[in-house]
């Protein structure tokens, strides 16, 4: 399926966030610890842990660091007592925003999230206000130049839902969360090395942004991601390459 990658629009800012790598690693380690506590230390039997490990590897985390995080979770590390909370809201141009947090104090967390929305021209919504606009999926991304037919055969035979070839030739493979590990393993075995792999929220509809609204959304995302309790920020804002180049 040809088209402009929904996933690329969600993640288009990641390359500019190297300065935040320490904070990103902290959040990845936290997810591994909690996933281990909730589902056990064996990634093959724990889809959440498998997804967390693959995401950590995509962000160049070492196996030693990952293994230490798993051991902390299996040993009852205090961070494993955190709970996952998702807040929903609206950004500029009616963009839908989902904020995934891990917290031991909901009052502190919601206060920070609400403040970030209000300072950036958005609004914190109620439960269910925008989550229907997102689907939870595994997304495995590949650079351009690969044999799409061979990849499609391997992906679909292993349970992939869809394959999307983007305008730049890169490829995104979509899976259900439960099939994510099996599809990733099959594509690895077929010789395809991914550039990113994670279970994420993919928007089913998009909100087009212009030169006025795109910077406002980016400021909102930055404000949210700077909060220690925030793990991930998802949105359905669509920023074209032409707009992105002018930001």
Swiss-Prot record:
Intracellular or extracellular location(s): Cytoplasm
Keywords: Cytoplasm, DNA-binding, Transcription, Transcription regulation
GO molecular-function term, one example from the UniProt record: DNA binding
GO CC terms in record: cytosol
Keyword DNA-binding attributed: yes
Record has DNA-binding as a keyword: yes
Signal peptide: none
Family: Belongs to the TACO1 family.
Protein name, as recorded: Probable transcriptional regulatory protein PBPRA1113
Organism whose genome encodes this protein: Photobacterium profundum (strain SS9)
